Swiss-Prot record:
Residues annotated to bind FMN: 67-71, 91, 144, 177, 213, 241, 265, 294, 315-316
Protein name in the entry: Dihydroorotate dehydrogenase (quinone)
Pathway the protein acts in: Pyrimidine metabolism; UMP biosynthesis via de novo pathway; orotate from (S)-dihydroorotate (quinone route): step 1/1
Reactions performed catalytically: (S)-dihydroorotate + a quinone = orotate + a quinol
Pfam short name (any one): DHO_dh
Cofactor: FMN
MF terms (GO), sorted A to Z: dihydroorotate dehydrogenase (quinone) activity
Organism: Mycobacteroides abscessus (strain ATCC 19977 / DSM 44196 / CCUG 20993 / CIP 104536 / JCM 13569 / NCTC 13031 / TMC 1543 / L948)
Listed NCBIfam families: PRK05286.2-1, PRK05286.2-5, pyrD_sub2
Keywords annotated in UniProt: Cell membrane, Flavoprotein, FMN, Membrane, Oxidoreductase, Pyrimidine biosynthesis
Length: 353
């Protein structure tokens, strides 16, 4: 109730400004041992049934913070105490860039969603690398890498290679982002020929587990092709899905006037779940599947787990649900695991298929 009142106040300020202020407040809380300890006591998962190990990394709980919130890894001390089982920072690019002109982040309140065209604003992979190397995070940290805007698509593999070389050694896993709608031509890199070059280049540069993040707007045939390529190349997994360019069934008025961008939150949930189910049917346990897109509560999270997701991510749900977002979801997952007679989280993965 209190957070809903705060949310109304937040909505009086531009979304990007609120993000800056809230993120600064979270970092301030986590900077001091007593307040960080208190936050950890209130929010961090403690039930051992939530823990899982995938691609050689132990995760204390399955819900992580999705890429986009902590673009430059400035809040690495925050995410574990706030209840997340891990965090994916970025997207970072080989060349630092300011992103698209403001305004570039918009609320869709009637849909509990967001529309963004941030454009990979970040300080660069070289700036993130030392933060990862010296971190004291209590949870795994992955790094999401994208293409620098000024780099032509023909040279994309070399650009991704640079980022992988810089952040790969200190990241628990790498996610190759070829699915944001906000960098011109980026989604074209999901074509199998181009994607093969990029993923092969990244794999040559790092020993960290490598995953690829895909768009919800791909055709089913394209999803199958990418899944097969991921298995062939020996990727650790697939993150599904990024934001959607679809405006179908949005309830928020005036969305047409907001311009281009990707939509996140509940509007992408159905397609995200559909893509997850298709991927699991295609690859089974040969790849780790991380589901993201419209996960608001424990019911949503559980639906993704039994459909085949080993890990989950949230961002928009965190914005709309507040600081206990991760805790409530993890508590709900633990209750469902025990009620269903599962001995571990991994036992529940794909159990509905």
């Amino acid at each position: 109730m209190l957070y809903q009142i705060l949310l109304r106040l937040f909505f009086l300020v531009s979304p990007e400004r609120v993000h800056t202020l809230v993120f600064a407040a979270l970092r301030a809380i986590a900077a001091f041992t007593p307040t960080r300890w208190l936050l950890n006591r209130l929010c961090a998962p403690t039930d051992p049934i939530l823990g899982t190990e995938v691609f050689g990394v132990h995760f204390p709980a399955p819900l992580g913070l999705a890429a986009g919130f902590d673009k430059d890894g400035e809040g690495l001390k925050v995410w574990g105490p706030l209840g997340f089982g891990y965090a994916e920072v970025g997207t970072v690019t080989a060349i630092a860039q300011p992103g698209n002109p403001k305004p570039r982040l918009f609320r869709l309140p009637a849909d509990r969603g967001l529309l963004n065209r941030m454009g990979f604003n970040n300080h660069g992979a070289a700036a993130l690398a030392p933060r990862l190397a010296t971190r004291t995070s209590t949870v795994p940290i992955g790094a999401n890498i994208g293409k620098s805007k000024i780099v032509e698509p023909a040279f994309a593999s070399s650009d991704y290679r640079v980022s992988a070389r810089q952040v790969g050694p200190a990241a628990d896993f790498l996610v190759v982002n070829v699915s944001s709608p906000n960098t011109p031509g980026l989604r074209d890199l999901q074509a199998i020929g181009e994607l093969r070059k990029i993923l092969s280049a990244v794999l040559e540069e790092t020993t960290a587990p490598v995953l690829v993040k895909i768009a919800p707007d791909l055709s089913d045939a394209d999803i199958d092709e990418i899944a097969d390529l991921a298995v062939e190349l020996g990727l650790a997994g697939i993150v599904a899905t990024n934001t959607t360019i679809s405006r179908a069934a949005l309830k928020t008025t005036g969305v047409e006037d907001l311009g281009a961008g990707g939509v996140s939150g509940p509007p992408v949930a159905a397609r995200s779940l559909e893509v997850l189910r298709r991927l699991y049917r295609r690859v089974g346990d040969r790849l780790v599947l991380i589901s993201v897109g419209g996960i608001e509560d424990a019911d949503d999270a559980w639906a993704r787990i039994i459909a085949g997701a080993s890990l989950l991510q949230g961002y928009t749900g965190f914005i709309y649900r507040g600081g206990f977002y991760a805790k409530r979801i993890h508590d709900g997952i633990a209750q469902r695991l025990r009620a269903g007679g599962f001995a571990s989280l991994q036992d529940a993965v794909g159990s509905a298929t």
